[in-house]
Amino acid sequence: MKVRILIEQDEDGIFVAECPSLPGCVSQGNTRNEAIRNVQDAIRGYLESLKKHDEPIPPSIDEEIVEIAL
């Protein structure tokens, strides 16, 4: 299974990673790679919890993140 994640660096320099298609799957790290590893763990835990409670896995959402200039 592949999911898209969004990574942003906050004002304190911390990288925040989230999976928009899986509500609540958010993590952070001091580096981009650490944030990715941490959100992967959060996603795995989320999916395991769904499976444990016989909940359906949300369908993949075709998302696109576009950067625009203002």
Language-model features and meaning:
Residues 23-32:
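A short, exposed loop/beta-hairpin motif centered on an aromatic-Gly-Thr core
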Residues 7-22:
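Short aromatic-glycine-(Arg/Gly/Cys) micro-motifs in beta-strand/loop hairpins
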Residues 1-4, 37-70:
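Short, charged, surface-exposed hinge/linker loops at domain edges
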